Amino acid sequence: MSNYTEVIQGHTLEYFDDEHQYIVDGICVPSITQILAVKFGHKYSGVSDKVLQNAAIRGTAVHKAIEDYCINGTESDLQELRNFKFLQKQYEFEVLENETPVILFKNNKPISAGRLDLVLKYKNKIVGADIKCTAKLDREYAAYQLNLYKIAYRQCYGVDWQLLRVVYLKGDKRKFAQVPINETGAWELIEEDGRFPD
């Protein structure tokens, strides 16, 4: 990912990759991932920095390969891309968007931002999806994350998703896993965060 500036719903969203920092209308806002840390903050405690760094590098490579394939048809030797293509053929989903920037609002005030991995069309439904390359698929984490993105995407683009899916790719493992829609739980997580008073 690289630095970018987008205008969404009249708000200027800037992203600075080196710091992983989002700025909306000149004000720093946490990423959706940082909001998730309220509930899942110690998710990787006990995992060495080296392992985390290698996993991050691999995850970035997988995301980039899928983005390049979806946008330009660029092929790659990554097994995860082959598995993505298998899932796409098996489930007959169409990629409508990838790496879509969003702003999350509370009471019309920007409180967070992020980039959504995929918007899909599947069985004539619009689906928000996230690519996961973790050692184990954490459906609870993915559900909170995708519900926050669901709210933000609707606020930014006026489109409501009917399903949430995880495209899980880890080595030879592949899943197109559904996670539940629970916007109430997502809003409760925002309240639990405490940084966003009414």
Region roles according to the model:
Residues 1, 197-198:
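C-terminal end-of-chain micro-motif
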Residues 1-113:
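Metal-dependent nuclease catalytic cores that hydrolyze phosphodiester bonds in DNA/RNA
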Residues 100-197:
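Mg2+/Mn2+-dependent nuclease catalytic core
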